[in-house]
Amino acid sequence: MQRASRLKRELHMLATEPPPGITCWQDKDQMDDLRAQILGGANTPYEKGVFKLEVIIPERYPFEPPQIRFLTPIYHPNIDSAGRICLDVLKLPPKGAWRPSLNIATVLTSIQLLMSEPNPDDPLMADISSEFKYNKPAFLKNARQWTEKHARQKQKADEEEMLDNLPEAGDSRVHNSTQKRKASQLVGIEKKFHPDV
């Protein structure tokens, strides 16, 4: 019972006051199967990437941490190819730092911070960790390429679909109110995908 009421509160908080760059929602109608999305931080190799995560809430939550993994591939020393994350707040003590006072928003914010500040001394991917430590330009290049390939494809496809469905500027249909609405929606989509433009 405590789990269900707490999850309702947390989901409401995530829906009404999400942390910057983070969204989280229920997948289907199951309250314990969530999806999250983290936007890559500015001035990081993940900038403008949209990273999807799976959040599974265990039966003993909040006494056990949520199980979170990346669904979007990411080039990072603390995240392996299966999306598993090496982060202390995702583990119980004594090896971890999970406490029942923490919540899903806090954990997702911690993951967002880990994306900005990798911990090469506690890696899941030794080769990427070594590259991060000893050849940072190569790490940054590879991480940017992975972000471009895996975390930006969907948004590019969405942008292209919207652009393909818009009439030409000289087309008389532009004056149709539906087309005007679509054109204004495109401006909103462009701002969503390119907020600095």
UniProtKB/Swiss-Prot annotation:
Its EC number is 2.3.2.23. Coiled coil: none annotated. GO terms for molecular function: ATP binding; chromatin binding; ubiquitin conjugating enzyme activity; ubiquitin protein ligase binding; ubiquitin-protein transferase activity. There is a cross-link at residues 191-192 (Glycyl lysine isopeptide (Lys-Gly) (interchain with G-Cter in SUMO2)). The active site is at 86 (glycyl thioester intermediate). GO terms for cellular component: nucleolus; nucleoplasm; nucleus. Changing residue 73 to K: Decreased FANCD2 ubiquitination. GO terms for biological process: DNA damage response; DNA repair; protein autoubiquitination; protein K11-linked ubiquitination; protein K27-linked ubiquitination; protein K29-linked ubiquitination; protein K48-linked ubiquitination; protein K6-linked ubiquitination. The modification Phosphoserine is found at residue 184. Its main location: nucleus. There is a cross-link at residues 91, 182 (Glycyl lysine isopeptide (Lys-Gly) (interchain with G-Cter in ubiquitin)). Pathway: Protein modification; protein ubiquitination. Pfam families: UQ_con. It is an enzyme of class 2 (transferase). InterPro entries: Ub_conjugating_enzyme, UBQ-conjugat_E2_core, UBQ-conjugating_AS, UBQ-conjugating_enzyme/RWD. Auto-ubiquitinated. Effects of auto-monoubiquitination at Lys-91 and Lys-182 are unclear: according to a report, monoubiquitination inactivates E2 enzyme activity. In contrast, according to another report, autoubiquitination does not affect E2 enzyme activity. Residues 149-197 are annotated as: Disordered. PANTHER family: UBIQUITIN-CONJUGATING ENZYME E2. It is linked to Fanconi anemia complementation group T: A disorder affecting all bone marrow elements and resulting in anemia, leukopenia and thrombopenia. It is associated with cardiac, renal and limb malformations, dermal pigmentary changes, and a predisposition to the development of malignancies. At the cellular level it is associated with hypersensitivity to DNA-damaging agents, chromosomal instability (increased chromosome breakage) and defective DNA repair. Accepts ubiquitin from the E1 complex and catalyzes its covalent attachment to other proteins. Catalyzes monoubiquitination. Involved in mitomycin-C (MMC)-induced DNA repair. Acts as a specific E2 ubiquitin-conjugating enzyme for the Fanconi anemia complex by associating with E3 ubiquitin-protein ligase FANCL and catalyzing monoubiquitination of FANCD2, a key step in the DNA damage pathway. Also mediates monoubiquitination of FANCL and FANCI. May contribute to ubiquitination and degradation of BRCA1. Directly interacts with FANCL. Interacts with BRCA1. This is Ubiquitin-conjugating enzyme E2 T. It comes from Homo sapiens (Human).
